């Protein structure tokens, strides 16, 4: 992460326990392997940095059923259960919450091998009574007589008090019972997440973030929270994906998008004034390069831009065209390769960063495509210049 985009890391003072969002899957795998012999992980990070999404994706890929407790929204009864009088024994019994993995033995034995993952989200924003109930879950793996399944994996996430989310500082009792990871936002992490078909990002957003990752011209969370006015939108991973990307998908063409007088305002409304203005300018300059269809037809000889950021804009415009057919895809891939200077191109049949971006985007956007390799082979066969 460049110095221009590292303001968020100052919140962690470059602590030794600081990791990237890209590291979350590996961290979860290590804790899952150790299971009950290891303290549960607590993932602390800026809001909108894809903590929950990363956990959900890991759970789905590793055979876990995710039970999410959004703790700020819950009362004590939601965790402890609701009291039901046992008149014969003259005691109060608590009926367990059906949304939590309470039960005897192993969950996997009766659920086709699937294991339960109890995700305690927004732990640091929970009320004190709920926080204390959650602490018993973490410490004793039970609340009263209600016991978690033996194979339950507990994971928690939240924000720190410095992040201006209304979070509370951890108590020593919680800090002593959890493995705490401070997670910094990662462009590469969100790009990898957005490349999945279920999380498909708009090509312009992906290209802009790719350009930032390659050139260091900004990144995620460029607004310092210490200077934030409390009113302007923030350029988080959530803002780019669920805000800006979803908004851009409403346009039918680049011309329609740039012809909208409110386009810059819409961009700023989703990711903040600074990031939104830069994004709108990135799109405008990329489109001004020329007619992308003419460039594709003359892929081997047309002029290409020299500005690294604008090159990513051209690559973004290739995505929708490349998915038309394999012949067009081959030409787009030739053009994508030419965006990388000859001296920096890999030898043989290895892809450049632009070719990799284009191929992944096309495979993600085109469900008719069988595999990445089918497109790759077709492209290699369509033009001998691919290896030059």
Please annotate each region the language model reported:
Residues 2-388:
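C-terminal regulatory/interaction module of P-loop NTP-utilizing enzymes
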């Amino acid at each position: 992460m460049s110095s221009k985009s590292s303001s968020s890391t100052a919140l962690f003072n470059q602590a030794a326990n600081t990791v990237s969002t890209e590291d979350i899957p590996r961290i979860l795998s290590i804790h899952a392997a150790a299971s009950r012999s290891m303290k549960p992980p607590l993932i602390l990070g800026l809001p909108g940095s894809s903590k929950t999404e990363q956990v959900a994706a890991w759970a789905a890929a590793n055979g876990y059923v995710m039970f999410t407790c959004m703790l700020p929204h819950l009362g004590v009864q939601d965790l402890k259960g609701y009291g039901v009088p046992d008149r014969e024994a003259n005691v109060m019994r608590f009926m367990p919450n059906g949304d939590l993995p309470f039960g005897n033995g192993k969950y996997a034995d009766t659920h086709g091998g699937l294991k339960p993952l109890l995700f305690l989200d927004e732990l640091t924003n929970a009320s004190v009574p709920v926080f204390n109930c959650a602490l018993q879950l973490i410490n004793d793996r039970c609340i009263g007589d209600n016991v978690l399944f033996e194979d339950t994996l507990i994971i928690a996430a939240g924000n720190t008090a410095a992040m201006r989310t209304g979070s509370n500082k951890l108590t020593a009792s919680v800090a002593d019972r959890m493995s705490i990871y401070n997670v910094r936002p990662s462009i590469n992490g969100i790009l990898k997440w957005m490349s999945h078909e279920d999380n498909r990002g708009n090509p312009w957003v992906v290209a802009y973030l790719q350009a930032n990752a390659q050139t260091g011209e900004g990144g995620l969370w460029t607004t310092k929270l210490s200077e934030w006015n409390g009113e302007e939108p923030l350029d988080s991973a959530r803002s780019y994906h669920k805000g800006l990307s979803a908004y851009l998908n409403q346009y039918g063409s680049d011309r329609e998008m740039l012809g909208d007088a409110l386009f810059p305002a819409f961009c700023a409304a989703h990711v903040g004034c600074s990031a939104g203005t830069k994004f709108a300018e990135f799109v405008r300059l990329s489109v001004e390069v020329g007619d992308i269809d003419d460039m594709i037809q003359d892929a081997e000889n047309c002029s290409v831009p020299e500005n690294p950021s604008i090159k990513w804009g051209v690559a973004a415009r290739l995505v929708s065209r490349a998915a038309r057919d394999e012949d067009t895809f081959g030409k787009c891939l030739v053009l994508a390769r030419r965006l990388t200077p000859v001296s920096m191109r890999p030898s043989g049949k290895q892809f450049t960063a632009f070719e990799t971006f284009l191929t992944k985007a096309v495979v993600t956007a085109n469900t008719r495509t069988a595999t990445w390799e089918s497109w790759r082979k077709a492209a290699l066969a369509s033009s001998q210049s691919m290896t030059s």
